[in-house]
């Protein structure tokens, strides 16, 4: 049985190193759609929502939640334009539905500082409003980013 299915983090099982210290990747930030199984009708019902959605206006800056190294910039189906950053200990942060990537990253810059601009929030992929979809993975297993950020639900 996979750790995520038991509600245990990979960290608790020793599969990943210590999680990076995270700051919200958009400001101001609140969670419009939490991590976990989504219920409802339609083709994406009862599927894992592998991150959190942080509403932001189109064109707002998405910034690095932790210092890291750019591992991928790609367009991927429902996620649209996304960036993956790797962090020590087997951790990855993922930023999806971007409208644009900063030119330096698109030109090959690889190291980023915490809070550094990555791109602009957009509506690429499948989305029901402008927001940043933010994921946290430990050795490839999705974790709830909200457990590492001081964020609450949008009101």
Question: Where are these predicted regions, by residue range?
Answer:
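Bacterial N-terminal signal peptides that target proteins for export
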Residues: 1-5
């Amino acid at each position: 049985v996979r750790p995520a299915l038991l509600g245990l983090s990979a960290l608790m099982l020793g599969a990943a190193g210590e999680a990076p210290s995270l700051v919200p990747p958009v400001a101001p930030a609140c969670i419009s759609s939490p991590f976990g199984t989504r219920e409802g009708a339609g083709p994406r019902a009862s599927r894992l929502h592998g991150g959190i959605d942080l509403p932001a206006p189109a064109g707002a800056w998405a910034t690095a939640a932790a210092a890291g190294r750019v591992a991928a910039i790609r367009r991927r189906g429902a996620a649209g334009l996304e960036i993956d950053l790797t962090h020590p200990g087997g951790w990855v942060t993922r930023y999806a539905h971007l409208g644009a990537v900063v030119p330096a990253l698109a030109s090959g810059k690889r190291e980023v500082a915490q809070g550094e601009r990555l791109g602009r929030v957009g509506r690429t992929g499948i989305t029901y409003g402008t927001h940043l979809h933010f994921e946290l993975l430990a050795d490839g297993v999705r974790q709830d980013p909200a457990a590492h950020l001081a964020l609450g639900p949008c009101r």
